[in-house]
């Protein structure tokens, strides 16, 4: 299909446009369904097939969308669009994150009303107990029905790795292609990452929870870091706020992004990344940094294995708990991560992986672009509180607390 005639509709884009929403962590992350990393998938797909964010036709959050009033959107997609992209992450799981449940029946009904070819790229299975050969038997029946139904609407489903392929095959679904994640390929075919000498490392963390020192720059993504997002973005200082948390925010070492371009621009200040966030690792790699992912779940394991993303998933500080206790332990952990970071293997595998992804797109008669994308500046920016404002709020907070204590003491006497 020519790019001129191509007009996609994105369902569950997880993108946020304009001013970042609201004054709570929940409202801020609502378009992204609770995790800013989700938006990276659609961002990459738009770069791949469209090349422009202006006028994007999309529904941001399928979990909160009112499908009872979806007639107008479905009719628009049917009349004006050529394809519907259903953006999913690791929803092949026994229970979803944050107590959510994808509205399977409503999504399937909406797609049928649209009457257009459906494209899915980046779907994964997630077993927190590792690669369970009986995992497919433990999935909710409604999810299994949904997977079979949407597979019939797609020419092929782009999936994350070998474990997902095994699960789908055991469910009787065969029209899939392993691609990893679209986000991994958003910078185009020529990407190479160089590893600096260990003595020159200037690392950033893909989650602040693994090491809590105020001097350690880190990226926040979801509700696991709610208290830190509340502090850094909204300036809310909780009772008993640890000193290192406050000073970490005041130094600008806690950041969150809804625009992947800004995310990568921040990461370019550093030359190494590590931590449990797989999309945090991918953002770092696309910013030119070697990165090591320390997550242990199957979602991460299969995608890192397929894409050759360096991974360190053993030892006491994998995942999020316990946090690394001190600078000495962090130094040792950093050394282990550095030694595990095989950028040569990743660089060598990338050209063939990129061609595989390109084949997935073009074999469905979709236009294929790569590289620059117009109007990415339309995506929302998140501004963290500055040092002066946070200190002013801290002084005011202490004054209010002191006044409340004096009043309580006076009332008791």
Which role fits each region the language model picked out?
Residues 1-413:
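Active-site anion-handling motifs in enzyme catalytic cores
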